[in-house]
């Protein structure tokens, strides 16, 4: 039985837990789970959300728990596309909770309230995503943040917690990782004020780094094979062939030097292996074409 904190939350920590597996083994286990979801047209996102809410120690009758459940239901109704889908949200939410658990094992535990805010943002960060010929920075993230904010307001979430959720969703903008990694640099032109404020708040910056890593973990931190599956999904969604140039751009311009959070850094060896992976001699060129 875990100790219960105030506000109906229970601590989630690594005390007495089994040792962490090797990062490669953990990555393969997570990829196997996600592969099973893909084969079975899963998961049941509301059911997964209920389990994750209980895992992090949030009482089911709290506003944050309500927000997580309602966000999952909204994403399930939307369903999404080949890559930006309900399953992607399930993976990112699971990744976020795994990264938080890994960090807790290394003495960087998050309080249940922050885990709940993180979970809510993960569950809705790409809702209503749609392709565009010319993407405007933060436009899609602002749309998702507004959707989550409306859900949170209806559930009675406090203003400061809603502000945090909005900022975390904005921080998943693909090119934002460099801004999170160097918060001392001036905010780039066009950055929303709430995100600029996040970079000055260590607590929120920590959550944003974790969510950004969770958003990329399935594509860059589990296994080369699962990275390829992610590329196939994206190729179908964009109806574009993705080759070595796109691969280099993803790792250089989006992922950057490495993961940002303590939990993400645990998977650094996996990232290095995936970044260096190339097709073996005699295998087809690593070009992913839309189905």
Predicted regions and their residues:
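Short alpha-helical hairpin
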Residues: 46, 51-75
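Acidic/histidine metal-binding catalytic segments
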Residues: 106-117, 155-173
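Active-site metal-coordination segments of metallo-dependent hydrolases
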Residues: 79-91, 131-146
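Surface-exposed cleft-lining segments at the edges of enzyme active sites
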Residues: 57-59, 130-133
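Short alpha-helical scaffolding segments that buttress acidic/His motifs in well-ordered protein cores
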Residues: 67-72, 118-124, 165-173, 210-214
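Short helix-to-loop capping/linker segments positioned immediately adjacent to catalytic or ligand/cofactor-binding
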Residues: 132-135, 152-159
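Divalent metal-dependent phosphate-bond-processing catalytic cores, especially two-metal-ion Mg2+/Mn2+ enzymes
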Residues: 2-53, 83-90, 95-114, 124, ...
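An active-site-proximal "capping" alpha-helix that borders the catalytic cofactor pocket
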Residues: 92-99, 139-155
């Amino acid at each position: 039985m875990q100790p219960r904190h105030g506000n109906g939350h229970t601590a989630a920590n690594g005390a007495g837990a089994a040792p962490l597996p090797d990062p490669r083994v953990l990555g393969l286990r997570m990829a196997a789970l996600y592969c099973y979801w893909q084969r079975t047209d899963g998961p049941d996102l509301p059911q997964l959300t209920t389990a994750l809410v209980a895992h992090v120690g949030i009482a089911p009758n709290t506003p944050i728990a309500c927000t997580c459940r309602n966000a999952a239901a909204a994403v399930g109704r939307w369903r999404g596309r080949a890559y930006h889908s309900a399953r992607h949200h399930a993976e990112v939410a699971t990744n976020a909770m795994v990264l938080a658990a890994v960090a807790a094992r290394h003495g960087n535990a998050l309080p249940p309230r922050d885990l709940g805010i993180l979970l809510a943002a993960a569950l809705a960060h790409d809702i209503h995503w749609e392709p565009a010929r010319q993407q405007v920075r933060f436009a899609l993230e602002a749309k998702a943040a507004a959707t989550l904010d409306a859900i949170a307001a209806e559930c009675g979430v406090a203003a400061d917690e809603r502000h945090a959720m909005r900022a975390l969703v904005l921080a998943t903008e693909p090119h934002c990782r460099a801004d999170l990694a160097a918060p001392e640099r001036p905010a780039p032109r066009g950055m929303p004020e709430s995100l600029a404020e996040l970079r000055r708040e260590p607590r929120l910056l920590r959550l944003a780094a974790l969510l950004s890593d969770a958003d990329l973990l399935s594509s860059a931190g589990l296994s080369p094979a699962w990275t390829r599956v992610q590329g196939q999904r994206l190729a179908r969604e964009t109806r574009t062939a993705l080759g070595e140039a796109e691969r280099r751009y993803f790792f250089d311009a989006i992922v950057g030097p490495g993961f940002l959070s303590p939990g993400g850094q645990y998977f650094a060896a996996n990232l290095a292996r995936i970044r260096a992976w190339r097709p073996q001699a005699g295998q087809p060129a690593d070009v992913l074409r839309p189905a």
